[in-house]
Amino acid sequence: EVMGIPLKEPGFYVVELASPRLGSALLGAERPYYVQTTALVTNLSVHLKLGREASLVWVTSLDKAQPVVAAAVEVRDCDGRVHWKGKTDAQGIARIEQPLPNVATLPYCFRNWDRKYFVTARTDGDFSFVFSDWNEGINPWRFHLPTGGYNGPFLATSVMDRTLLRA
């Protein structure tokens, strides 16, 4: 059963629906089945790029795919502690020109291994967010790209070629 929910204003909504049809199909009785979900109604898209020495947040509009100027941006952990706040520039970019704490040192969110940043963007009348670990649908393995779990300070690649060794 698919149905639209008439949420007319931007915001983050927590919704509970009662479905008699699902109740009779899933519960085997004539009573409603309750389904809870959340819905984000927004015209903002928030993009996060974490770096070791600096990071950035890019905010764009969904309807025009244009940068959003002067959006208020906050970077928080799951305890709600603010690690950075600022505004986007003319290109819709908020430049975080300082190292953020390593994700491994953040307080956990839902499980002991689940640590992430929660980044919000606000404009007059609109709000959106992104978590630093959201990658559903763009996982590297889907595109046959190699991945690894190294978080150290240095990464080196060796190039070995016979012509290089002959010198």
Predicted regions and their residues:
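N-terminal, cleavable Sec-dependent signal peptides of secreted/periplasmic/extracellular proteins
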Residues: 1-167
